[in-house]
């Protein structure tokens, strides 16, 4: 394979630029040419495809977002869009493509694979909800950003004896809420993967103030309900604290990526190039126990799939993604309502 392309699709995530940089420079080191596709699958279909060189990705590793830009393009789910995209790739002499994005992006890569066009997926999403990998590109930065802002909210909540409900992104996954909540010393963490009792939530808040707490923070994953709705539910259940709601929202997607995200993205990007060089498409790159692994993208893009690693190093797809609820149990132990 002598010429490949790279695109970013779906929601942006810190570290995408680092992944693009790794794809470009690793490919060049292997004697391959690299093209960039602007605005994901939309740019593929419309032919917004252009050559990249080492200078094209200079000074990008520290930048958030994606300089290739991103777009959601549901038309690519249709056969006509897929065939137009492949036609444009072949028109530019491209033999394989690296797709950086979330599960929707993986579905697009799966369609390319079904049509016999080699595609390799990289997990780029802050939600950490992609199967086939322990961590996704952007997750670590999103957690760090959430923790920074939770720390700031702790300052103001302590000054006014307030309870804060802080909504964080994650779609149907509670990973950001769990990791940031524990790191910020949240009093309660509410995630989609675990049922909660609103009366118990309110009771915990009351017990905390009765024990001498001056403020409380509840971290809420957006997949449960909105922060405003959760606050209304608390009030309906009898909460009488001075309650405020903050939604961190898209703030978690921005900013310079952490060192961990930069390294992870660099490793994954280089690994993807190696797979394409070997003529191996139809795969998604992941990290498992700090080692690079690849999984069949046809399995990972299916609803409710999850990988497990066998003793032979093979990937088995079987169960849906689940946040590590051991973290939820840990937070209940650490957020003792009798302590400040």
Swiss-Prot record:
Its EC number is 2.7.1.11. It is an enzyme of class 2 (transferase). Gene3D superfamilies: 3.40.50.450, Phosphofructokinase domain. ATP binds at residues 11, 72-73, 102-105. It catalyses: beta-D-fructose 6-phosphate + ATP = beta-D-fructose 1,6-bisphosphate + ADP + H(+). Pfam families: PFK. It is found in: Cytoplasm. Substrate binds at residues 125-127, 162, 169-171, 222, 244, 250-253. ADP binds at residues 21-25, 154, 185-187, 213-215. The active site is at 127 (proton acceptor). Catalyzes the phosphorylation of D-fructose 6-phosphate to fructose 1,6-bisphosphate by ATP, the first committing step of glycolysis. Homotetramer. This is ATP-dependent 6-phosphofructokinase.
């Amino acid at each position: 394979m002598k010429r490949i392309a790279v695109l970013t699709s779906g929601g942006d995530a810190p570290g995408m630029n680092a992944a693009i940089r790794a794809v470009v420079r690793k490919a060049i080191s292997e004697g391959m040419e690299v093209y960039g596709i602007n605005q994901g699958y939309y740019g593929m279909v419309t032919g917004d495809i252009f050559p990249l060189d080492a200078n094209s990705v200079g000074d990008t590793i520290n930048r958030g977002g994606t300089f290739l830009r991103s777009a959601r393009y549901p038309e690519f789910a249709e056969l006509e869009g897929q065939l137009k995209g492949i036609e444009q790739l072949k028109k530019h002499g491209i033999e394989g493509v690296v797709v950086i994005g979330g599960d929707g992006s993986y579905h697009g890569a799966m369609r390319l694979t079904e049509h016999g066009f080699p595609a390799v997926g990289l997990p780029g999403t802050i939600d950490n909800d992609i199967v086939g990998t322990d961590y996704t590109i952007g997750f670590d930065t999103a957690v760090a950003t959430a923790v920074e802002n939770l720390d700031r909210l702790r300052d103001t909540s302590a000054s006014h004896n307030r309870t804060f409900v802080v909504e964080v992104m994650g779609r149907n996954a509670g990973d950001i809420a769990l990791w940031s909540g524990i790191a910020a010393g949240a009093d309660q963490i509410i995630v989609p993967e675990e049922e909660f009792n609103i009366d118990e939530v309110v009771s915990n808040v009351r017990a905390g103030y009765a024990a001498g707490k001056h403020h409380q923070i509840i971290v809420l994953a957006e997949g449960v309900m909105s922060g405003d709705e959760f606050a209304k539910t608390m009030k309906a259940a009898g909460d009488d604290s001075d309650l405020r709601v903050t939604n961190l929202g898209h703030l978690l997607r921005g900013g310079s990526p952490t060192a961990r995200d930069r390294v992870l993205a660099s490793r994954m990007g280089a690994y993807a190039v190696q797979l394409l060089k070997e003529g191996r498409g139809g795969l998604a790159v992941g990290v498992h126990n700090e080692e690079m692994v690849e999984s069949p993208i046809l399995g990972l893009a299916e609803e409710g799939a999850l990988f497990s690693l066998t003793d032979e190093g093979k990937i088995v797809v079987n169960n849906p993604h689940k946040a590590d609820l051991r973290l939820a149990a840990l937070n209940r132990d650490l957020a003792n309502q009798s302590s400040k």
